[in-house]
C-alpha cells in the first residue's frame, strides 16, 4: 500500500507515516523532515495551495491523508489551508478516479464550535465529502512525543497561576491509540469521533504538571474572576487567547466507543504529563 500525507512534516502527519506501516510513503510539505527521510519517505516539496502540484502529487497513491495545519503553511490563513487546500486535494483525487481513500483530520464536537476555526473545519469537511471513499477523523486533543501542547503546558505549570477556570474537557488521545483506531476504521466511509473516556480539563492538566514539578496548584476561578484569570494566563505569552478559549470547550463524546473497541488500555495524558515533567537523566 502507498500513502501520501499532506502536511507530513507536522506532528500528526509524521506519526501517520511512522505508525501506519505502508510499503511506500511520501509527504507533501514546504518543509523537509530528517525524521521522515530516515524512514525512507519521499519528500514532495510544495504548497497545498498550488493546484497543479497537488493534482500531480496525489497520483499513484492508495491513501491520501490531509493533515496540514495552518502553522505548517507559513503566511497562509486557516481558511486557505483547510478549505482551498482541501479543494485542490479533492480535485486531484477526482481527476485520478481510482477510488483512492481520502483521510482528513478534523476535530471532535465540530458542530458545537462557534469560532472561525470550527466554522472553517466544517466547510472543509463538506469538501471532503465530495470524495465517496473518505474517512473524516475527528479526534479530541492528540498527544505524544513532539506534540504541540505538552511542552507549553509544562511552561504554564512553571508560572505563577493563582486561578483559572475549571471548565471544559480535553479528553486527550495518544497518537499511537488514535492510529490504532484509524487503521481499524479504513473500511469506514464517513466520520469517526475519537476521545478519551477519562475527563481532564485544561486546569487539571496544568495542576497535574504543577504537582509533578513540585509546585502549588492553581485554584478554580469563580464567576467574578473568570475573565481576569483567562486574561492573565494569555498574557504569559505561552498560549494565544484563541487557544486558551478552545481549551475551555468540551471535547468529550459519549458515543465514541472506537477507542475502547480497538485499544484495551488507552494511554493516559496525566501519566504522560507527569513523565514529561520529570528531569531527564
Q: What are the language-model segments listed below?
A:
Residues 3-22:
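N-terminal Rossmann NAD(P)H-binding glycine-rich loop of SDR-like oxidoreductase domains
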Residues 35-88, 92, 108-112:
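NAD(P)H-binding glycine-rich loop region in Rossmannoid oxidoreductase-like domains
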Residues 70, 84-122, 130, 135:
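Conserved Rossmann-fold NAD(P)-dependent oxidoreductase catalytic core, especially the SDR/UDP-sugar
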Residues 79-83, 114-125, 147, 171-172, ...:
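Short-chain dehydrogenase/reductase
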Residues 112-116, 137-154:
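Flexible, glycine-rich beta-alpha linker
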Residues 136, 166-179, 191, 199-202:
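Conserved loop-to-helix N-cap of the C-terminal "lid" that shapes the substrate pocket in Rossmann-like
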Residues 153-173, 185, 193-195:
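A conserved pocket-lining segment of Rossmann-fold NAD(P)-dependent short-chain dehydrogenase/reductase
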Residues 184-240, 253-256, 260-281:
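Mid/C-terminal beta-alpha module of Rossmann-like enzyme folds, strongest
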Amino acid at each position: 500500500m502507498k500513502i501520501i500525507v499532506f502536511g507530513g512534516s507536522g506532528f500528526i502527519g509524521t506519526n501517520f507515516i511512522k505508525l501506519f506501516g505502508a510499503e511506500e510513503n511520501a509527504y507533501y510539505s514546504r518543509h523537509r523532515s530528517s525524521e521522515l527521510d530516515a524512514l525512507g519517505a519521499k519528500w514532495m516539496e510544495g504548497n497545498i495551495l498550488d493546484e497543479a502540484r497537488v493534482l500531480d502529487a496525489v497520483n499513484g497513491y492508495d491513501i491520501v491523508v490531509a493533515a496540514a495545519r495552518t502553522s505548517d503553511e507559513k503566511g497562509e490563513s486557516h481558511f486557505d489551508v483547510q478549505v482551498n487546500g482541501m479543494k485542490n486535494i479533492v480535485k486531484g483525487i477526482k481527476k485520478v478516479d481510482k477510488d483512492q481513500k481520502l483521510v482528513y483530520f478534523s476535530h471532535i464536537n465540530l458542530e458545537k464550535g462557534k469560532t472561525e476555526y470550527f466554522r472553517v473545519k466544517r466547510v472543509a469537511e463538506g469538501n471532503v465529502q465530495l470524495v465517496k471513499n473518505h474517512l473524516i477523523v475527528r479526534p479530541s486533543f492528540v498527544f505524544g512525543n513532539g506534540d504541540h501542547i505538552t511542552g507549553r503546558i509544562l511552561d504554564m505549570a512553571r508560572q505563577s497561576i493563582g486561578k483559572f477556570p475549571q471548565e471544559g474537557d480535553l479528553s486527550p488521545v495518544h497518537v499511537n491509540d488514535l492510529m490504532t483506531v484509524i487503521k481499524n476504521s479504513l473500511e469506514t466511509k464517513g466520520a469517526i469521533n475519537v476521545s478519551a473516556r477519562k475527563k481532564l480539563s485544561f486546569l487539571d492538566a496544568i495542576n497535574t504538571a504543577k504537582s509533578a514539578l513540585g509546585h502549588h496548584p492553581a485554584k478554580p476561578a469563580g464567576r467574578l474572576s473568570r475573565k481576569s484569570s483567562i486574561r492573565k494566563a494569555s498574557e504569559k505569552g505561552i498560549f494565544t487567547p484563541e487557544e486558551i478559549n478552545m481549551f475551555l470547550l468540551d471535547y468529550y463524546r459519549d458515543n465514541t466507543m472506537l477507542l475502547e473497541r480497538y485499544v484495551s488500555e488507552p494511554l493516559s495524558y496525566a501519566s504522560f504529563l507527569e513523565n514529561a515533567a520529570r528531569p531527564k537523566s
